[in-house]
Amino acid sequence: RLYKWQKMCYTIYGSGDTMHEAMYAEEMENGAVKCRLCPHHCVRREGKLGLCGARMNHDGHFVSLNYGRVTSLGMDPVEKKPLRRFMPGTMTLSAGSFGCNLACPYCQNHAIAHGSPESQYVPPQGMARLAVKQDVPSLSFTYNEPMVGYEWVYDAARTAKEAGVKVILVTNGYVEREPLARLLPYVDAMNIDLKAFTEETYRTVCGGA
């Protein structure tokens, strides 16, 4: 069931572009492209997806397939992120897309992260506008792995900051330093979801590089 504010958001924006030029990609020989967003460093030929399922080689360029594609939109207590000492007692606007660069067998959001859920297009500025309209002090990128939708998260986080909305990132932390450092000035709080305690387990169980 959609709440009135969710219907309003989806009705206003409807469908939009399904491809967006990806950042942190390197063109290689024979039309292949190498992604430098996360440690997988996927090298893909024309029409092939990265391991995250959200980035693809299209005409010799890496594109983001989930830019603005919101699959889950909700209003949560900030403690559900879970954050205990950041703006306690407040609600946060939570948004997620699809795709993940890990493959944990115990993922509670597997249908979102690795499936093909229905989505609606919401431009980056739409998230800040919705948070302000609903009088919610923060915006959370959650549900799936936000880093595999880096371009939209980056744009939405910047516009949220400009609107005075706090930004929360719920992530597995599996990202390269350069893109993370570029995003951090627009992030107010972060929950890095620890999946395992050893590199071996990350590789053999969680699908890390």
Residue ranges and their predicted role:
Residues K4-T90:
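Flexible, acidic/Gly-rich N-terminal and inter-domain linker regions that tether
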Residues C206-A209:
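Glycine-rich S-adenosyl-L-methionine
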Residues K195:
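Cell-envelope and extracellular/periplasmic
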Residues N57-M190, T198:
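Conserved Radical SAM active-site core
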